[in-house]
């Protein structure tokens, strides 16, 4: 929600200020959430000490209600100390060598695959995303895609492409069952392509004449595109739908602007995607350091914003840079509960797959809750659940139980009547 997002503006940077103003107008960001302050510019890197000063200044001015931040500058994009963190992760966690360091295991994010909708309140974490647009015109186009996505419930295709680049295709086991698992999801078709037997040369040195062995082309309804290549060809031949998420597993996708000779994550935005992700230093191919498609897709279709879905999909995000329009929310549908005659009617699309939900009843003056009904959720989709109420002339209280925000395996109170 706009009230939960703080926009970080590089004071004196005309492009950052113009982009921030455009975003504020498009998303109705409260003025109190516009954080303008001097930011060291002219370099893609900010040192650990200078970043600590910057972060302290930001934290001191953030409203207590802010749950996430948007970065409107493009320099700096990473924080350099003993190792490098993406600035979006450094803003969320603070700079720490436990969050980066080449091929080593890095710190786990408590936000990964959680059900928290208020990460700062629940976990002390403010996820951050860099808009990633180099010009005002590019930013306006990206913002417009995000706004157009809201509530659109698009019909489109998600592409999961395993290439002959084995080192960069290590995420494919997560993709194998997704087309079947989502086969009945309204409007969504997931396609897994195994091109691992293609020429290794075509994967490592793709050209403009590449074919399905290395990339998709001439697709008109791309909602998701996840692959593993140093550089992804033929992006411009595809049409990305508003709200589309896309990324490629490679070492330096977040190392802006040049990605050390690889393709930067911002190329996805230039091609029409609404958000992407890349790492700012060599992470090696730990799958935990990159988005997990099964998690991202589920949270997104449950009604999460794009910043929530992307952040929840990365288990070890310290070396990562998240780029795009954070508030895009194609499948927004707030849960509703109403009394209809002698029944409670619950409507939602945000139920967690394979999780238990329960409605309890307690008579007025009573102390014990009694379960009225229990259900196990399936795929994220609109669900209407009608729960008969007890014929108690005195009436009573109702409560809605489901996965805890930070420990989804446990049941917590999600809502309760007065």
Predicted features, each with a name:
Residues 332-418:
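Low-complexity, Ser/Thr/Pro-rich intrinsically disordered linker/stalk segments at domain junctions
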């Amino acid at each position: 929600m706009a009230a939960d997002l703080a926009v970080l503006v590089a004071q004196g940077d005309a492009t950052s200020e113009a982009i921030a103003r455009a975003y504020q107008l498009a998303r109705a960001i409260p003025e109190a959430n516009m954080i303008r302050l001097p930011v060291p510019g002219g370099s893609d890197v900010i040192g650990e000490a200078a970043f600590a000063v910057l972060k302290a200044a930001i934290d001191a001015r953030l409203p207590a209600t802010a749950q996430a931040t948007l970065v409107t500058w493009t320099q700096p994009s990473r924080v350099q100390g003993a190792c490098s963190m993406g600035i979006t992760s450094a803003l969320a966690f603070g700079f720490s060598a436990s969050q980066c360091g080449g091929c080593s295991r890095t710190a786990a994010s408590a936000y990964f695959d959680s059900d928290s909708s208020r990460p700062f309140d629940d976990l002390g974490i403010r996820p951050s995303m860099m808009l990633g647009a180099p010009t005002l015109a590019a930013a306006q186009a990206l913002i417009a895609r995000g706004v157009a996505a809201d509530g659109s419930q698009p019909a489109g295709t998600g592409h999961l492409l395993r290439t002959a680049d084995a080192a960069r295709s290590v995420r494919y086991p997560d993709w194998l069952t997704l087309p079947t698992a989502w086969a009945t999801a309204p409007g969504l078709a997931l396609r897994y392509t195994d091109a691992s037997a293609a020429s290794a040369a075509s994967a490592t040195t793709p050209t403009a004449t590449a074919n399905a062995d290395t990339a998709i082309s001439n697709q008109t309804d791309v909602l998701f595109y996840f692959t593993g290549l140093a550089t992804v060809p033929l992006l411009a031949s595809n049409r990305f739908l508003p709200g589309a998420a896309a990324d490629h597993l490679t070492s330096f996708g977040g190392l802006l602007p040049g990605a050390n000779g690889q393709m930067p994550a911002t190329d996805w935005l230039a091609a029409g995607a609404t958000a992407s992700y890349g790492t700012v230093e060599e992470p090696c191919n730990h799958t935990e350091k990159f988005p997990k498609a099964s998690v991202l897709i589920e949270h997104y279709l449950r009604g999460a914003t794009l910043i929530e879905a992307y952040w929840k999909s990365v288990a070890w995000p310290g070396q990562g840079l998240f780029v795009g329009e954070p508030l895009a929310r194609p499948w927004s549908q707030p849960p509703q509960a109403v009394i209809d005659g002698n029944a409670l009617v619950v409507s939602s699309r945000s139920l967690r797959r394979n999780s238990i939900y329960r409605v309890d009843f307690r008579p007025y003056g009573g102390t014990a809750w009694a379960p009225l009904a229990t259900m196990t959720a399936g795929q994220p989709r609109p669900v209407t659940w009608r729960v008969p109420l007890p014929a108690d002339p005195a009436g009573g209280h109702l409560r809605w139980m489901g996965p805890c925000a930070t420990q989804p395996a446990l049941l917590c109170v999600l809502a309760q009547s007065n």
